[in-house]
Amino acid sequence: MLKYLFAVQTIVLLGFFPGSVHSDEINLPAEILNLDGDREYGEYLASDCKTCHEADGSGDGIPNIHGRPKIQLITLLYAYREKIKLNEVMQMQAGRLSNEEIVALAAYFEGLN
C-alpha cells in the first residue's frame, strides 16, 4: 500500500495526468505573440466563455479566468486548440478560434476583475 501511495504522489508531482501541461512547456508561435488583441472584439466573443467561467468563481470546479494575465490565457487557449492540453470541451471551444480571436479573448478577460 505504501509503494502505491508513493507512486501516486510521484505521478501527481510530475504532472502526468491528462491536461497537466505547464505553460512554460508550450512554445507559442511568433505570429500569436506579436498580436495586441482587441478587447472589444474579445468581449463580443466572450459569451460562450462566460457560460462556464463565471466571474464569482461559482463555476463548479471550472476555473475563473477573469483578471488572469493575458499571456497565460493565450498560452492556455493555444494549448487547447492545438490539443496539447487535454479537455474535450475546451479543445472544441478553442479549436474554433483564430490567433486573433485567442488574443482578443485574452485581452478582454485580463481586464476584468
Question: Where are the language model's segments positioned?
Answer:
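Electrostatic cytochrome c docking/interface patches
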Residues: 22-45
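The canonical Cys-X-X-Cys-His
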Residues: 42, 47-56, 105, 109
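Positively charged n-region of N-terminal signal peptides that target proteins for export
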Residues: 1-4
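Cleavable N-terminal signal peptides
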Residues: 10-11, 21
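Gly/Gly-Pro-rich "capping" loops immediately C-terminal to redox-active cysteine motifs
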Residues: 39, 43, 58-85, 91
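C-terminal capping alpha-helices of c-type cytochrome domains
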Residues: 24, 95-113
